Regions:
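Well-formed, non-transmembrane alpha-helical positions, independent of function
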Residues: 16, 63-64, 82, 167, ...
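Short, glycine-/small- and polar/acidic-enriched structural segments
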Residues: 1-44, 53, 71, 77, ...
């Protein structure tokens, strides 16, 4: 769900970020680790070749772009869609999900479902039914945009349904289980561990961390 937006036409590749200032959020969390990894893998030193300007909230980073105080930002959805509608000349320069896949060979993970092992084992049939419903929900989110957007507004996920409906196709909402899920998560955890072992509790998770189904 991460994208680099630019008010201009100078950034068409990760390498084009050299010498630029990027406003973003998430220092010490996923956005920073993802950005640093993608920059490094493309030959851009995140400590010397670019300036990373972090803010605590995406709204703060967006306000810098809106005020003309920054021209490049890395933002998540739905802030990207909101920004594109509010800032004349702003465009999506890089899809960081695609850039991650190019260098990592797996999908970028930004959200997961977790469950207590004892609860799953106590009633596997009930958990399987829940997973079927969860899968159907993901499919609905990607195909029934109008109703999904209405729910986003109803439950306070996004302020306006119209904004949610525009943003949903670019939110990369997927349902992964089994080996595919494990592969993507292991790649992601390895990147986090290399950046800061404490970000994953000091060690990589064992095989029993993952639900095989």
């Amino acid at each position: 769900v991460l994208y680099v937006v630019e008010n201009g036409e100078t950034v068409n590749s990760v390498e084009d970020l050299k010498g630029k200032t990027i406003v973003t959020t998430g220092k010490g969390t996923t956005p920073e680790y993802v950005l640093r990894y993608i920059l490094t893998e493309n030959g851009v030193d995140p400590d010397n070749d670019v300036t990373l300007d972090f803010y605590s909230e995406a709204t703060e980073a967006l306000s810098k772009v809106q005020a003309g105080e920054a021209t490049i930002a890395m933002l998540p959805q739905p802030f990207v869609t909101s920004a594109l509608s509010q800032v004349e000349g702003l465009r999506v320069a890089l899809d960081m999900n695609e850039e991650w896949e190019k260098v990592a060979g797996s999908k970028l993970v930004t959200g997961v479902l977790v469950a207590r092992k004892d609860a799953v084992e106590a009633d596997p049939a009930r958990f399987a039914a829940f997973m079927d419903g969860y899968k159907a929900s993901v499919e609905a989110a990607n195909t029934d945009l109008e109703n999904t957007a209405a729910l986003c507004e109803q439950y306070g996920i996004v302020a306006k349904a119209a904004l949610a409906q525009k943003a949903l196709p670019n939110c990369n909402i997927v349902f992964e289980t089994g080996d595919e899920m494990k592969t993507d998560l292991e790649t992601y955890f390895n990147v986090l561990y290399a950046a800061d072992p404490t970000s994953v509790g000091g060690q990589l998770p064992a095989d029993d961390f993952y639900y095989a189904g």
